[in-house]
Amino acid sequence: MEILTKEWNSYIESMKSALTKNKEWQEELDSCLAMAEDAKNGAEGKIFDLAAYKANHGIDFKESVAFLNKKADEGDIFALKTLGFLYCLGVFNPFDKSKNSLVEIDTEESEQKAASYFKRASDLGSVHANVWFAMHDCIYAAVESDKPEENTEPAPSSEDFLKAERSALKAIEESKKPGCDCTPEGMSTIYYWLSRVYASNNPLNPIHDEEKSKYWEEKSKKFKK
């Protein structure tokens, strides 16, 4: 993968310009320069980190995503998670807003891609990916129930609610194991969405339970602190 490309150099120059108005960019600039230098010198891990950073910011996008996909096909969990988050959260480039449209999130295609990457990472043992995969089930069951007249997706069935509960509780249980790669933010979020599943008033929801909903909502709030 090419390191010091025209797009990358332009991004670095934009960051340097931003420093004149906001000194907080200094830390990120230093990190990017060090990462690129290490990658240029052949440090495998840094090449990987640079590809992930570039993809997330829409820099040399096709090449960066191709590099990550190659690693993902080799069974690299971090590459799979990075691609999952890319299609779940999208691209963000503060200096070139046109890059943000490289990935259109909240579409059926992007959600399917994100779920596919998380599922592959989960199958390889990533609890973090499993949490996000379970969260996808919870969000579908909870959100699609809120305003059915505005939804384009098929309405969730009773089994969708049960599936969301099963996958969330399984991910939560696995997060207690030693060496878990979960983040506090990820766990807090899965607690929140599980609470939303229990709170759903959809008549097809067989697990509606206000008490359980409040329990997981409170757990989510405490986990953030």
Task: Identify the role of each PLM range.
Residues 71, 120-121, 171, 220:
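Canonical positions in the second alpha-helix
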Residues 19, 51, 56-58, 89-108, ...:
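Short coil/turn linking the two alpha-helices of tandem helical-hairpin repeats
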Residues 186, 199-225:
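Terminal, low-structured helical/coil segments at or just beyond the last alpha-helical repeat
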Residues 46, 79, 129-131, 183, ...:
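The tetratricopeptide repeat
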Residues 21, 39-43, 74-76, 90-91, ...:
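Short helix-capping/linker turns of helical repeat alpha-solenoids
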